[in-house]
A protein has these predicted regions:
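Proteins enriched for Cys/Gly/acidic motifs involved in redox and nucleic-acid/cofactor modification
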Residues: 1-192, 231, 246, 268-279, ...
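Conserved beta-strand core positions
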Residues: 3, 40-41, 135, 182, ...
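Short strand-connecting beta-turns/loops that link adjacent beta-strands
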Residues: 36-37, 68, 144, 253, ...
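Short glycine-enriched, charge-decorated loop/helix-capping segments at active-site entrances
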Residues: 47-48, 156, 196-199, 259-265, ...
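Conserved SAM/AdoMet-binding glycine-rich loop
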Residues: 74-78, 83, 93, 176-300
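Conserved, mostly hydrophobic/aromatic
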Residues: 147, 167, 184, 220, ...
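Terminal RNA-binding accessory module
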Residues: 332-432
Length: 432
């Protein structure tokens, strides 16, 4: 059977999609790029915030249109399927099956029945849907933190860490098929292992992953500030493969709001962690995520956030307006902020960060940096790639450069930076 697949949402959901596609291919089915050629369509949805839910619903309706012309089966899974299982089944009759996340332990058998496979759909080798030299590895699922604004624990449950042995089996396979950049992900990577080993095991995992031959860059995303302990930093410093990239979602800088968000620790603790990182890794890249317009946020508290951004000068920052998510503690809080004020604050915050980013990038002019070559622009001698300071999938900026010699995509080269914009830098490939 020909199967169309649509994956929405974050990189953690993408890993789920790649694993589902692996099972489908093992069952003898073919993944097709164009839904019009499909006999069944699977939509792996996101349901994290309102805009993601809207995108998921719109995609489901778009895929449902193919049922008008063909006898297409429409299967919906993922976060939206978990959060609104009954609603989807009742209100969108075009859907043939809704498979919530917490039924993924029976996913293989459900797909086998729906798709009519004669082959057992069990754990299979990973499909990589993006560039073959880059892959994500999800080290745990769910989250045991209870941030007041976040629906992830409602959707995916408490943290469930994989064993190191299971992770290493996947890592070794990915390295064997040519993956050079490995990105470890979870809702909270620094809490990895606490649920099944009884202690924080990220340092041990990093030490084992760094021994795998073929890997060139190892990156860790989603690190909770108070869990970036000395052993984590020590493990990262022990291997040149582990890039000094620290993704620390902080959410705000006002201690009253941090407490209201149910975030652990005041901003002063984050300052101490940042100082420690810079001491051990002078060339570290620091990234964070902020929320503006959380209930009761005053103008003065927002300005405190702006001042904090100016003080830290994060290399990278993503920011979002607060999204009111039902069944979360923040949903019924007094002092909900008007959308217009939220958007205005977001624009002001990102304008400040844009200037900081531009300043940081301009400091790179004249330097020679290592770049992973990812794209060639047409027939010209211009390429696009990323440095160790840039996370995959356009999360951060790019390095745009020229080369006198043709370059192999997926290779690493040296680039001298000659110009810089707010988010991208420009340069010329130089010989080793």
């Amino acid at each position: 059977m020909k199967i169309g697949f649509v994956s929405l949402g974050c990189c953690k959901n993408l890993v789920d999609s790649e694993q589902i596609m692996s099972m489908i291919k093992r069952g003898g089915h073919e993944i097709v790029a164009n839904p019009k050629d499909a006999q069944a369509i699977i939509v792996n949805t996101c349901g994290f915030i309102e805009s993601a839910k809207e995108e998921s619903i719109n995609t489901i309706f778009k895929m449902a249109k193919y049922k008008e012309r063909n006898l297409v089966k429409l299967i919906v899974c993922g976060c939206l399927a978990q959060r609104y299982t009954d609603t989807l089944r009742e209100e969108i009759p075009e859907i043939d099956a809704v498979i919530p996340i917490r039924e993924y332990d029976t996913l293989a058998s459900q797909l086998q029945k729906l798709l009519g496979s004669d082959t057992l759909l069990d754990k299979a080798e990973r499909v990589i849907t993006g560039n073959p030299w880059q892959a994500y590895v999800k080290i745990s699922d769910g989250c045991s933190n209870r941030c007041a604004y976040c629906a992830i624990p409602l959707i995916r449950g408490d943290q469930k860490s994989r064993t190191i042995e299971d992770i290493m089996e996947e890592v070794n396979y990915l390295a064997s098929v040519g993956v050079k950049e490995l990105t470890l992900i979870a809702q909270d990577t620094t809490k990895y292992g606490l649920d099944n080993y009884g202690k924080l095991m990220l340092p041990e995992l990093l030490r084992q992953v760094s021994k795998v031959e073929g890997l060139h860059w190892i990156r860790v995303l989603y690190m909770y500030p108070d869990e970036i302990v000395d052993d984590v930093l020590q493990a990262m410093s022990e291997s040149e493969k582990i890039v000094p990239y620290f993704d620390i979602p902080m959410q705000h800088a006002n201690n009253r709001l941090l407490k209201l968000m149910n975030r652990r620790g005041p901003k002063e603790d984050v300052l101490k962690v940042v100082d420690k990182i810079h001491t051990m890794f002078p060339n570290a890249t620091l990234r964070t995520t902020m929320i503006v317009g959380f209930p009761t946020e005053t103008e003065e508290e927002f300005e405190e956030l702006v001042d904090f951004i100016k003080e830290i000068k994060w290399d990278r920052m993503g920011a979002f307006t607060y999204s009111k998510e039902e069944d979360t503690p923040a949903y019924d809080m007094d002092g909900q902020i008007d959308e217009e004020i939220q958007n205005e604050r977001l624009a002001r915050l990102m304008a400040v960060q844009e200037e900081i980013s531009k300043e940081k990038n301009q400091e790179k002019i004249g330097r020679v940096i290592e770049v992973l070559v990812e794209e060639k622009e047409g027939l010209v001698d211009r390429y696009r790639g990323r440095s160790a300071a840039d996370a995959p999938d356009e999360v951060d900026g790019q390095v745009i450069f020229t080369s006198d010699e043709p370059l192999e995509l997926g290779s690493f080269v040296k680039v001298k930076i000659t110009d810089a914009k707010s988010y991208d830098v420009y340069g010329t490939c130089v010989s080793e």
